[in-house]
Amino acid sequence: MKGLVHGVCALVAASYWVGIAGCTSGYHRGNYLALEQARFVDLTHAFGADTIVWPTEGDFRLVGQQAGETPGGYYYASNRLEMAEHGGTHIDAPIHFDKNGQTLDQIPIERFVGTAVRIDVSTPCARDRGYRVSTRDFEQWEAAHGRIPNRAIVLLETGFARFWPSRKEYLGTELRGREGVGALHFPGLHPDAATWLVRERQVKAVGIDTASIDYGQSTQFETHVALLSRNVPVFENLANLRALPDRDFDIIALPMKISGGTGGPLRVVAVLH
């Protein structure tokens, strides 16, 4: 973990130094010192035997290949990963719902790094598992916290991360296959609100702490289409959003770079200054 944190710091520092986030160019020691004093929040569920996947997908598997002493006298361990693109904390690439959209390896890295806001919709979602976040929710948030910055990463906190890893509570069902898809019941983002985020706030990306940016009962996935057809990637199954402030923090969301991928596992880190 220590090595990971140091690696994250180095990456964030690089973004500040060379302008990945569009904030600066060149070397600024002050930015590095600010990062040294920053707090990092991991927004990623660990992948393991209890990782939640879409009802039609196979479970994540870590298959042991070798572990032990070698003839050369040194210890060696290696595993093989078996996983769906769209399971656990992951990204949806535009091609997931747009035949002309960007594949995972084609998404500009600028989409993964930037200032972010957290929209807390946990109260209405607690009352209604089928709640869809509306434009009015965004207008009310802006009345309380100020305008959502243009080109921000918007994170929607439904409160459903607290149910992880219970499939029954998180997805609304333990059923698998098509029957399981038909029984899904969790909140999401209304397609009209998604269109508003794209047109009025030019968002970089949208994330949510449920299994899908569309609510569970969706059959046409209009919200996916509204975002991905405009090359706005989606982050799903986020964790620990409750630990974030409402605004003025940064996000680094780096997916595995898969050629031709429609999605993939995502490590998401918030940087609190």
Language model region names:
Residues 1-7:
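Positively charged n-region of N-terminal signal peptides that target proteins for export
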Residues 7-21:
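Bacterial N-terminal signal peptides
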Residues 22-273:
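Active-/binding-site microenvironments in catalytic and ligand-binding cores
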